[in-house]
Amino acid sequence: MAKMMQREITKTTVNVAKMVMVDGEVQVEQLPSETFVGNLSMEQAQWRMKRKYKGEPVQVVSVEPNTEVYELPVEKFLEVATVRVEKEDSEEQVAE
């Protein structure tokens, strides 16, 4: 049996709506859901949606975080992963 690597990942599905004028009345138009890696708050999701739909009146309706455990055989991980190179102290100081 192959050795497996496991990682718990949280993704957040953001449901968003847009306000539109139809015959002089404001109506809500549901937009496609967006999924982001991480556990986003309503405020974080609203900020991201405002950036995506610049200038449009959008409102986040709900955020739905979902955490799942993913696994991958170690051999496959080694095929696709890259070796992390540690930065030297002088490089880190310049970056700051």
Curated annotation (Swiss-Prot):
DNA-binding interval(s): 1-19
Pfam family of the protein (one):
p6
Looking up InterPro entries in the UniProt record yields: Histone-like_p6 (IPR035188)
What keywords does the record list, in alphabetical order? DNA condensation, DNA replication, DNA-binding, Early protein, Repressor, Transcription, Transcription regulation, Viral DNA replication
Identify the domain of life.
Viruses
Question: Biological process GO annotation list?
Answer: chromosome condensation; DNA replication; viral DNA genome replication
User: Anything noted about its domains?
Assistant: The N-terminus is involved in DNA-binding.
Subunit text? Homodimer. Homomultimer. Binds to double-stranded DNA giving rise to multimeric nucleoprotein complexes. Binding specificity for the viral DNA is based on supercoiling, the viral genome having a negative superhelicity lower than that of plasmid DNA. Interacts with the DNA replication protein p17; this interaction optimizes the binding of protein p6 at the viral DNA ends, thus favoring the initiation of replication.
Protein name per Swiss-Prot or TrEMBL: Histone-like protein p6
Organism (species): Bacillus phage PZA (Bacteriophage PZA)
